[in-house]
Amino acid sequence: MIPGEVITPETDIELNVGRETLKVVVANLGDRPIQVGSHFHFYEANDALQFDREAVKGFRLNIAAGTAIRFEPGQSREVELVALAGKREVYGFAGRVMGKLD
């Protein structure tokens, strides 16, 4: 092994296997691009994004860690979300939950 070397399996690595997911259509009604990161509580995303907020409470984007999705002004697209795991407590972000989800 070489210091810093990363050895990965030859097969694809599946993310969030067995976790609850849902698909939602999101529209950017604003006049500026909006980017949402992989671990942002989607329910608390920018108010210029239009979607069923109650349906996505407790979910985040189902994309690789450290990545994001950009919504251009006037753009509408379908995204897949995955349920938050662990204690299912949310603090910070836009301050709309500040506690337990369930």
Curated annotation (Swiss-Prot):
It comes from Acinetobacter baumannii (strain ACICU). Heterotrimer of UreA (gamma), UreB (beta) and UreC (alpha) subunits. Three heterotrimers associate to form the active enzyme. InterPro entries: Urease_beta-like, Urease_betasu_sf, Urease_subunit. Pathway: Nitrogen metabolism; urea degradation; CO(2) and NH(3) from urea (urease route): step 1/1. GO terms for biological process: urea catabolic process. This is Urease subunit beta. NCBIfam families: PRK13203.1, urease_beta. The keyword Cytoplasm applies. The keyword Cytoplasm applies. Its EC number is 3.5.1.5. Keywords: Cytoplasm, Hydrolase. GO terms for molecular function: urease activity. It catalyses: urea + 2 H2O + H(+) = hydrogencarbonate + 2 NH4(+). It is found in: Cytoplasm. Belongs to the urease beta subunit family. GO terms for cellular component: urease complex.
